[in-house]
UniProtKB/Swiss-Prot annotation:
Protein name: Cytidylate kinase
One Gene Ontology term, aspect cellular component: cytosol
Subcellular location: Cytoplasm
Main location class: cytoplasm
Species per Swiss-Prot/TrEMBL record: Klebsiella pneumoniae subsp. pneumoniae (strain ATCC 700721 / MGH 78578)
Family: Belongs to the cytidylate kinase family. Type 1 subfamily.
Catalyzed reaction equations: CMP + ATP = CDP + ADP; dCMP + ATP = dCDP + ADP
Enzyme Commission no: 2.7.4.25
Keyword vocabulary terms for this entry: ATP-binding, Cytoplasm, Kinase, Nucleotide-binding, Transferase
Length: 227
C-alpha cells in the first residue's frame, strides 16, 4: 500500500534552495526524487516530440496520464529522463517554457499530472520538491518541510547564479520579479503557496546550504523514527 511508503515534501518559494536540498536528501537517504516544477515542462516536451497539440486538453490528458519520466540525482546533479532520454537541457528552452505554460492551464491535465506525481511514491521513499507537495499532492506525508528565505536573499542568490553563467543582471529588477511571483503564488485561488499546518518552516536566509541540509536531514530522521 503506497500510504506506508514514506514521503518527505519540500515546499517553498523559488530561490529558497529547494532543488539543492532535495537532491542532497535523495542521495543521503537513497530515495526517489520528484521535481514537480519540471513535470509541466517534461509534458510539454513530450507533446512536442509526439506532435501533440499543446492547446488541446483532450489530446494532452492521455499523454499526461502515462508520462514516462524519471528524476535521477547523482553527485548533486539532477538528470531528467523522458522515455529513456536525458532531456535536462532540452526542457529549459524557451519553446518548452512557452508550451509548458499552455499545458498547465488545463484543469484535466493538472488532474492527470497530480495522479502521475503520486505514482512516484515508491519504496524505499520519495523526496518531493514543489510548491504544494505537502498541502495538495502528499497531504499525508510524515515529513513536511517548508523552505523559505527573504526575497532579498533569494534575489542575491539568483543574481550570483546568473553572473556565474556570464549574464549581466539588474538586482532591483530581479528582486521585483521575485516579489511579484511570490505575490501570485501566495494569493492564487488554487493551491496557494503556504506551509502545511504540520510542516517545519525552515528559514535559510542566514544559513549556508550545508547547514540547511544538516537541519533538514536531522528533522526528517527524527520524524521518521517515530512515524
Amino acid at each position: 500500500m503506497t500510504a506506508n511508503i514514506p514521503v518527505i515534501t519540500i515546499d517553498g518559494p523559488g530561490g529558497a534552495g529547494k532543488g539543492t536540498l532535495c537532491k542532497a536528501m535523495a542521495e543521503a537517504l537513497g530515495w526517489h526524487l520528484l521535481d514537480s516544477g519540471a513535470i509541466y515542462r517534461v509534458l510539454a516536451l513530450a507533446a512536442l516530440h509526439h506532435h501533440v497539440d499543446v492547446e488541446s486538453e483532450e489530446a494532452l490528458v492521455p499523454l499526461a496520464a502515462h508520462l514516462d519520466v524519471r528524476f535521477i540525482s547523482t553527485d548533486g546533479n539532477l538528470e531528467v529522463v523522458l522515455e529513456g532520454e536525458d532531456v535536462s537541457s532540452e526542457i529549459r528552452t524557451q519553446e518548452v517554457a512557452n508550451a509548458a505554460s499552455k499545458v498547465a492551464a488545463f484543469p484535466r491535465v493538472r488532474e492527470a499530472l497530480l495522479r502521475r506525481q503520486r505514482a512516484f511514491r515508491e519504496l524505499p521513499g520519495l523526496i518531493a520538491d514543489g510548491r504544494d507537495m505537502g498541502t495538495v499532492v502528499f497531504p499525508d506525508a510524515p515529513v513536511k518541510i517548508f523552505l523559505d528565505a527573504s526575497a532579498d536573499e533569494r534575489a542575491h542568490r539568483r543574481m550570483r547564479q546568473l553572473q556565474e553563467k556570464g549574464f549581466d543582471v539588474n538586482f532591483e529588477r530581479l528582486l521585483s520579479e521575485i516579489k511579484e511571483r511570490d505575490d501570485r503564488d501566495r494569493n492564487r485561488a488554487v493551491a496557494p503557496l503556504v506551509p502545511a499546518a504540520d510542516a517545519l518552516v525552515l528559514d535559510s536566509t542566514e544559513l549556508n546550504i550545508e547547514q540547511v541540509i544538516e537541519k533538514a536531514l536531522q528533522y526528517a530522521r527524527e520524524k521518521l523514527a517515530v512515524a
